[in-house]
Amino acid sequence: MNILAIGAHPDDIEFGCAPILIKEVRQGNQVRMLVLSRGEAGSAGTPEVREEESRKAARLIGAAVDFMDFEGDCHLEYTPENALRIALEMRRFKPQIVVAPHPQENQHPDHSVAGKLVRDACRFARYGGLVELKSMAVHRVGNLFFYNITQHLQKPDIVIDISDLISEWEAVMNCHESQVTSKSYIELQKTGARLLGLTIGTEYAAGLFTNDPVRLETISDLALSSRNF
């Protein structure tokens, strides 16, 4: 299975859903990270440094990573043209699952813009008549999920036990040395994961939000209860 994880900036994917991706890599799935900027507007770290930090983190995750140029950090625009560019990458990689930042407004506008672009791109990727995408065969994404970078969204639709991956996740986040030396971002993420874990009776957990209803063949797939306490 191919899984495409998309972030607006270097470190979004790593802080938002890296443990989930590590689990998938260990299951033998192919993971590609697609980053829409190099953090050009940030106060810490140059674009070159931040790109290298992402590449280092991707190696720990076991994923490939690529960067797209959308005029830089803080200049990501919600336009059909930008969604089409992302859709072309979807046709190229052919993911069955896509994960992206939640489109709900939060503290950085690029996160919500990225989520909206990816949502549209998933639709565009399956449209056969789009001349802008004619160079690649039509592809239908199976499911789109959104991850949360901050901790103030509503309760996630899917909660995944990541208790056995905390040290690996911390190592991935520490790859972004330029971003974690002055603020306790890692502790913030771990605290959020700990609180989410309490809701399912595990030490740590990560959440995903659905874009569409999740299709099942049988409810026995849901036999694992979150009520372990």
Language-model features: locations:
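Metal-dependent de-N-acetylase/amidase catalytic core
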Residues: 1-4, 78-229
